[in-house]
A protein has these predicted regions:
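ATP-dependent carboxylate-amine ligase catalytic core
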Residues: 7-93, 111, 140
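Short glycine/serine/threonine/alanine-rich loop segments
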Residues: 10, 130, 152-156, 206
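Short loop-to-beta-strand entry elements in the cores of soluble alpha/beta enzymes
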Residues: 127-136
């Protein structure tokens, strides 16, 4: 989503976690991470308030991201939840679109030990009269999302699974909405991620053309996701069973 919007001329802020190499990666504008100076400036300004209310690490970084995006006057911000959704620090926002990907068992001691329990937490990011896009997945999980969407009068759309998925040494190729795409990331799940992103883009700005989306996806790079180090070595940071699969 971020890469497509940037290729379309938007000034985009993105907040993700965790970081791979250094903290600055979590907060980026126009593809560039926040500077050390920007981090120090925020902490100097906010330290008294942080100490007063006892903010957690993630709460502090979330506010840092919001403040940085405000300073940089971004056109759109992409905010990834840290853990779950319902009680996540990021869930104070009023999004223009909510997006939920695949549900798998993770942080079970906090979110619950079944897909349905985790889905209830994830459904917390569905907001009143706000479009929500979700992965095609188990009916039990989709039912939970649908019930929350109905309660919030939110239009829920289930992203279709791409067709003709082919994974080879160059990445992943697939067909979505009768159009062909290629991404340099490896795995059928990356085709599904891209398909979901395309659906979100078409909802957010239907004027963005196929050529722009196609070119942007070909330039997507996410280090640590089946990253090819050399001819026979791949590097991946998956930390649970579903991620490895």
């Amino acid at each position: 989503i971020e890469r497509i919007l940037r290729y379309s001329g938007y000034k985009v802020g993105i907040y993700t976690s965790p970081h791979l190499f250094n903290f600055n990666e979590r907060i980026r504008v126009g593809g560039q991470p926040i500077s050390d100076k920007g981090i120090v400036s925020f902490l100097d300004h906010a330290s008294e308030e942080i100490d007063k209310i006892g903010s957690t690490f993630f709460e502090v970084t979330t506010v840092m991201a919001f403040e940085y995006f405000k300073q940089k006057k971004v056109d759109i911000a992409i905010i990834e939840t840290g853990l779950g959704g319902r009680l996540d620090a990021t869930n104070v926002i009023s999004p223009v679109i909510s997006v939920i990907t695949s549900i798998s068992i993770d942080h079970a001691e906090i979110l619950g030990d079944s897909p349905e329990q985790i889905a209830l937490e994830k459904a917390g990011i569905i907001k009143d009269k706000t479009p929500v896009f979700v992965y095609q997945q188990d009916n039990e999980v989709l039912d939970i999302f649908q019930k929350k969407a109905i309660a919030c009068n939110a239009d829920m759309k289930i992203s279709r699974i791409p067709k003709n998925i082919n994974v080879n040494s160059k990445g992943t190729q697939f067909t979505f909405n009768n159009q062909d795409y290629a991404i340099p990331l490896f795995g059928s799940h990356q085709a599904r991620n891209a398909g979901l992103a395309i659906d979100v883009i078409n909802q957010f700005d239907p004027h963005i053309k196929y050529d722009t989306i196609h070119k942007a996806l070909k330039k997507v790079f996410w280090p640590g996701r089946m990253q090819k180090i050399d001819q026979r070595v791949f590097y991946d940071v998956s930390h649970n069973k579903k991620g490895m699969e």
